[in-house]
């Protein structure tokens, strides 16, 4: 169970804040189910292309991603989250990521669970499986060989503290 995060933009919060300020009292606003569905939009369509290279021994050396996410009629797709997560769990020295926020003649898109991340992760993990198979390395071992760990620099700059990626993969053995 659980809501797993909000599914729509917060339209009520600013209205409640203004009403509370004007009245001097707390204000609670609740949408019914119909209003909640009408205030959101569809999840964004996406096109994800991932290329990865590794040595014959299985060490990832380079990766490239092209991410195009539909935003609907106005900019605002979750392509930024996709770009941050596409190679986040791997230690790859050479990375290029192109992310496009595409406006199209459709309703605005909105967030659902892990907006932007799942699309990118699926592209990466599919390629990782294919690469491991081509190299004759068991996929879990391939992931362990290349897992991000403390000190790994993510493609968009931050250096990881201890994140537990290796420990999770080892527990899966």
State where each predicted segment sits.
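Structural alpha/beta core scaffold segments of enzyme domains
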Residues: 1-173
């Amino acid at each position: 169970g659980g809501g797993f995060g909000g599914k729509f933009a917060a339209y009520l919060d600013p209205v409640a804040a203004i009403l509370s300020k004007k009245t001097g009292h707390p204000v609670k606003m609740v949408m019914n189910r119909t209003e909640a569905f009408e205030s959101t939009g569809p999840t964004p369509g996406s096109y994800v292309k991932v290329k990865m290279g590794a040595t014959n021994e299985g060490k990832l050396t380079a990766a490239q991603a092209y991410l195009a996410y539909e935003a609907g009629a106005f900019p605002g797709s979750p392509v930024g989250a996709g770009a941050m997560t596409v190679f986040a769990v791997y230690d790859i020295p050479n990375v290029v990521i192109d992310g496009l926020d595409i406006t199209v003649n459709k309703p605005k898109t909105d967030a659902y669970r892990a907006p932007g991340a799942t699309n990118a992760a699926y592209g990466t993990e599919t390629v990782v499986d294919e690469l491991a198979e081509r190299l004759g390395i068991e996929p879990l071992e391939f992931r362990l060989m290349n897992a991000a760990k403390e000190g790994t620099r993510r493609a968009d700059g931050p250096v990881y503290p201890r994140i537990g990626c290796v420990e999770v993969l080892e527990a899966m053995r």
